[in-house]
Design a protein with these regions (language model features):
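Hydrophobic alpha-helical transmembrane bundles of multi-pass membrane proteins
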Residues: 2-196
Length: 196
C-alpha cells in the first residue's frame, strides 16, 4: 500500500503545469519586463521622436500630448477599458463586469501571471496606440481637442478592435491571431492617422 501511494505521489510530479492554476514566476517576470519596455517606447521614446520631428516651438506641446495621453488612457483603462476589451463574450465589445477592476484580486491569474500584471501589460498597448496617432496631428490640434479625441478614439476604435482580436471576440473566433499588435495597434492607429 505504501509503495502504491509513493508511486502515485511521484507520478503527480509529471503532470504538466498547464493543468495547475498556479503562478509562473518566469512568465510573470517576462511580462513585467515587456511592460516596462512597451511603456518606455511611449514615454520617453515616442514623445522624444515626435518632439524631434516638429518645429522647436512645438516640442514641449508634443511631449505634453504624449504624457497626457498616457495619463488619460491609464485612467480610462482602469475605469472601463480593461472590462470592455477582455471581459464578456460579445462579438464586438465586452461588458462592464470588471469596471473599476471589479472582481480583480491579487490572487486572480490569467495564463499563469497575476491578472494585475496582465492588466498593466495590456494597458501599455492601450497607451501607445493613441500616442502613435499624435504624429498625424502634431502642430495642428489644440491640447483640449487632442485629449477629447484620444479618449473617444480609444473607446470607439481601440477597445472594440482589442476585444475582437485579443479578447475572444469575432475576429478571434474566425481564427485571426495577432501576436504583436499588427492589427490592434498598428492598423487601427494607422487608419486613424490617415483619416485625420
Amino acid at each position: 500500500m505504501l509503495k502504491k501511494l509513493l508511486l502515485l505521489n511521484i507520478g503527480l510530479f509529471f503532470i504538466p503545469s498547464i493543468y495547475a492554476a498556479e503562478l509562473n514566476s518566469g512568465d510573470t517576470s517576462w511580462i513585467l519586463t515587456s511592460t516596462a519596455l512597451v511603456l518606455f517606447m511611449t514615454l520617453p521614446g515616442l514623445a522624444l521622436f515626435y518632439g524631434g520631428l516638429v518645429r522647436s516651438k512645438n516640442v514641449l506641446s508634443v511631449l505634453m500630448q504624449c504624457f497626457a495621453i498616457a495619463c488619460l488612457i491609464s485612467v480610462c483603462w482602469v475605469v472601463y477599458g480593461y472590462s470592455l476589451a477582455f471581459k464578456g463574450d460579445g462579438l464586438f465589445i465586452g461588458n462592464l463586469s470588471a469596471a473599476f477592476l471589479n472582481g480583480v484580486s491579487r490572487d486572480s491569474l490569467v495564463g499563469g501571471v497575476p491578472e494585475t500584471v496582465f492588466i498593466t501589460f495590456q494597458m501599455t498597448f492601450a497607451i501607445i496606440t493613441p500616442a502613435l496617432v499624435v504624429g498625424a496631428f502634431a502642430e495642428r490640434m489644440k491640447f483640449g481637442a487632442m485629449c477629447l479625441f484620444s479618449v473617444v478614439w480609444f473607446t470607439l476604435v481601440y477597445l472594440p478592435a482589442c476585444h475582437m482580436v485579443w479578447g475572444g471576440g469575432y475576429l478571434a473566433n474566425i481564427g485571426v491571431i495577432d501576436f504583436a499588435g499588427g492589427l490592434v495597434v498598428h492598423a487601427t492607429c494607422g487608419i486613424g492617422a490617415l483619416v485625420i
